[in-house]
From Swiss-Prot:
Known EC number: 5.4.99.27
Gene3D superfamilies: 1.10.1510.30, 3.30.70.3160, TruD, catalytic domain
A GO-annotated cellular component: cytosol
Active site: D76 (nucleophile)
Source organism per UniProt: Syntrophotalea carbinolica (strain DSM 2380 / NBRC 103641 / GraBd1)
GO biological process, one term: tRNA pseudouridine synthesis
Function of the protein: Responsible for synthesis of pseudouridine from uracil-13 in transfer RNAs.
Gene name in the database record: truD
UniProt name for this protein: tRNA pseudouridine synthase D
The keyword Isomerase belongs to this UniProt entry's keyword annotation: yes
UniProt entry tagged with the keyword Translocase: no
GO molecular function, one term: RNA binding
Length: 398
């Protein structure tokens, strides 16, 4: 992300995530627990690990089936996070007695249903920004005021683009049916790879020395090695790519959707709060979308942050905007050389698409400075990212 909604306001610079305690994420539940039922909701604090690692360690310690465990969202590994995990066949006393390194069970309460992905209202963030100037607090508060009035640009950002920053390019190549290009991106550009064995494997792949490339790639890179093996055995690039795990391929496609969405946010960054006739508007209270036939009539609702303009996560079923907003969307598709129907990929890979608001509300903001450190707190709805707020406040790559 190179664009700023608050471009006229200077950032505070600084650095984040010097240690996991500098970045605290607290999950905001979608509904309260009722106190009865077969599912036990654990409020868990983890430090410096992924949600998947947390699930694995809890399942072993509690001797419960990991597949029966539920969670509402994935949380940052390079942080201290508090989130809810649902388990069955476990007592509250057993869970609360657990003593695990970097894991704390904060509470345990029963509920009737399993926790599912998306069952959260949002997240609250408390972030320490270090190495800042003496006037950082005033600058941060000025920026936060603008974000509260206008909304936060709903960028995905580059965290979805993988280790080489090219996941969206893999997704693009798949949608464009250029599977040879997709395979090349999956193996990686040697000039962008630091790991020596991976780099050597990528060089050999680029030279079409497939057997040597397969041997050179690190053994932990199973998907890449399997891809090269499929090609070496004579399969087409399309068949070789499609043999990769569907979950991985959908991540690539999702990254491409996110990339295109971010480009549309950038195009409308200077007027995120302004509705256009032909927009598809998003209702913040229930997530419903509708066509704006009279922008002037609906604008007061946008001013109250009841509704916002949207852009598509492109897919074969997505509702497209009309008039000026529709022209922007169609122009981007034309530039990419694709249509919404190109996301109809079959074999479990088809992406139906959806609308996503261009902006999201930020609430419960607080800031405090002690010397060259600033503590920043705020809450965001689910599906949005703290990095966007930090991007605006710091004016640096986050």
């Amino acid at each position: 992300m190179a664009n700023y909604l608050t471009a006229k306001l200077p950032g505070i610079g600084g650095s984040i995530k010097t240690c996991p305690d500098d970045f605290l994420v607290e999950e905001l539940p979608l509904y309260p627990t009722c106190g009865e039922g077969e599912h036990l909701y654990l409020e868990v604090e983890k430090r410096g690990m992924t949600t998947f690692e947390l699930l694995k360690r809890l399942s072993r310690a509690l001797q419960v089936n990991e597949r029966a465990m539920g969670y509402a969202g994935l949380k940052d590994a390079q942080a201290t996070t508090r989130q809810f995990i649902s388990v069955t066949d476990c007592s509250a006393e057993q869970a609360l007695a657990l003593q695990l390194q970097d894991i704390r069970i904060l509470s345990a309460r029963r509920h009737r249903n399993k926790l599912r992905l998306g069952h959260l209202a949002g997240n609250r963030f408390t972030i320490t920004i270090r190495d800042i100037d003496s006037d950082a607090l005033e600058k941060a508060r000025d920026i936060l005021h603008v974000l509260q009035m206008t909304g936060v640009p709903n960028f995905f950002g580059e965290q979805r683009y993988g280790a080489l920053g090219n996941s969206h390019l893999i997704g693009q190549a798949i949608v464009q049916k250029n599977f040879s290009q997709a395979a090349a991106h999956i193996i990686g550009d040697p000039d962008k790879i630091i790991h020596p064995e991976w780099r050597q494997g990528a060089i050999l792949y680029a030279e079409n020395r497939l057997e040597e490339a397969e041997q050179a790639l690190p053994r932990r890179m199973r998907n890449e090695r399997n891809l090269v093996r499929s090609l070496r055995q004579g399969r087409s690039a399309e068949k070789a790519v499609r043999r990769l795990p569907g979950k991985l391929l959908r991540l690539y496609l999702s990254a491409y959707q996110s990339h295109l969405f971010d480009r549309l946010v950038s195009m409308r960054l200077e007027s995120l709060e302004t509705l256009w006739t032909g927009d598809i508007a998003y209702k913040h209270d229930n997530g419903a979308c509708f066509l704006v036939t009279d922008a002037a009539l609906e604008q007061p609702r946008a001013d109250r942050f009841e509704i916002s303009p949207t852009a598509p996560l492109f897919g074969h079923k997505v509702m497209m905007a009309e008039a000026q907003a529709g022209i922007l969307e169609q122009a981007l598709l034309a530039k990419e050389g694709i249509t919404p129907d190109d996301f109809r990929l079959g074999a479990g890979l088809s992406m139906p698409g959806e609308r996503r608001p261009l902006r999201i509300p930020i609430s419960e903001t607080a800031s405090n400075q002690q010397g060259n450190e600033l503590e920043l707190s705020f809450s965001l709805p689910k599906g949005s990212f703290a990095t966007t707020v930090l991007h605006e406040v710091m004016k640096t790559d986050v």
